[in-house]
Amino acid sequence: MGAMAPRTLLLLLAAALGPTQTRAGSHSLRYFVTAVSRPGFGEPRYMEVGYVDNTEFVRFDSDAENPRYEPRARWIEQEGPEYWERETRRAKGNEQSFRVDLRTALRYYNQSAGGSHTLQWMAGCDVESDGRLLRGYWQFAYDGCDYIALNEDLKTWTAADMAAQITRRKWEQAGAAERDRAYLEGECVEWLRRYLKNGNATLLRTDPPKAHVTHHRRPEGDVTLRCWALGFYPADITLTWQLNGEELTQEMELVETRPAGDGTFQKWASVVVPLGKEQKYTCHVEHEGLPEPLTLRWGKEEPPSSTKTNTVIIAVPVVLGAVVILGAVMAFVMKRRRNTGGKGGDYALAPGSQSSDMSLPDCKV
């Protein structure tokens, strides 16, 4: 990563650990683009990563020995050579545009050319189970903060600061929202449907969670009960703790669903309970891979000595998954701004079936 700051690495890791959230039964196509300047270490590093339903399927990395769009899932390998050549050309063109924008951002924010800066973009669409558009995304960021984003109406922009207001006005004059909306409502949805069809054995499968409860004594004398759900797909899952049939929403700690690094996901929910009262509490797990919801409780047949082993089982996949994804993704964390200038952000959306499945704005300023 060269000169990337530790803070940026932590933010990227946090983003990598957290899959995007979609409505149960829906599907998503997302692209995450990152350009990181690194003075003294050559040109900025540029990466693109594509996800279908939180599963990485394509990647481009300018630091690769032979930078090209690469398949990251077996089902995408069936695309022909023209697909990979087209996507590689587009990615290399966008790489140059993002590098120009990084330099422009320095002028907008009166920053020194000696530091490392990050420009990121995320776009994609969510569709219902019947293929209808649920929501579109088109967001830019710079150096750790939001910059500008297309609103849910896909017609207007939200600008985060004064510099972004300049961009908003230019994009409004150029009709950028209309062109972005056309992509999100058209090509994005069409390509997502195609990917779901081609990768149905992987993307439309259901892996039920393996669930168990662990027991952790606290210095205060009470106990933490933690309910684990492992190895499930898709990512949508519900974990709740109950006491006498009532959900303990306020008392419960719930982590974000996290990738395990093997194509499945993990999650846990915990609650602090009085020592000796553990069996009064039940964990409830709901997932589309289960024929019916699971109900679990801590039992005397499951001794506290097993806690360490169970914790290690989940910790190792989470860490490995984070490393794999961080190395693969440079994942999206909403950043501060996106720059346009003299040409007002010209967009290249190729029409027809041979068009790219992903269209980025021409970032020239």
From Swiss-Prot:
Disulphide connectivity of cysteines: C125-C188, C227-C283
Extracellular side: 25-311
Keyword terms, alphabetized: Disulfide bond, Glycoprotein, Immunity, Membrane, MHC I, Phosphoprotein, Signal, Transmembrane, Transmembrane helix
Signal peptide, first to last residue: 1-24
PROSITE patterns for this protein: IG_LIKE, IG_MHC
Renumbered residue ranges of the record's region Alpha-2: 115-206
Role summary: Involved in the presentation of foreign antigens to the immune system.
Region (Alpha-3): 207-298
GO biological processes: antigen processing and presentation of endogenous peptide antigen via MHC class I via ER pathway, TAP-dependent; negative regulation of neuron projection development; positive regulation of T cell mediated cytotoxicity; T cell mediated cytotoxicity
Gene3D superfamilies documented for this protein: Immunoglobulins, MHC class I-like antigen recognition-like
Transmembrane segments: 312-334
SUPFAM superfamilies on file: Immunoglobulin (SSF48726), MHC antigen-recognition domain (SSF54452)
Alphabetized InterPro entries for the sequence: Ig-like_dom, Ig-like_dom_sf, Ig-like_fold, Ig/MHC_CS, Ig_C1-set, MHC_class-I_related, MHC_I-like_Ag-recog, MHC_I-like_Ag-recog_sf
Lineage of producing organism: Eukaryota, Metazoa, Chordata, Craniata, Vertebrata
Family of the protein in this entry: Belongs to the MHC class I family.
Region (Alpha-1): 25-114
Source organism, top-level taxon: Eukaryota
Protein name: H-2 class I histocompatibility antigen, D-D alpha chain
Glycosylation sites: N110, N200
Major site of localization recorded for this protein: membrane
SUBUNIT field: Heterodimer of an alpha chain and a beta chain (beta-2-microglobulin).
Topology in membrane: Single-pass type I membrane protein
Domain Ig-like C1-type: from-to ranges: 209-297
Residue ranges, annotated region (Disordered): 343-365
GO cellular component: external side of plasma membrane; lumenal side of endoplasmic reticulum membrane; MHC class I protein complex; phagocytic vesicle membrane; plasma membrane
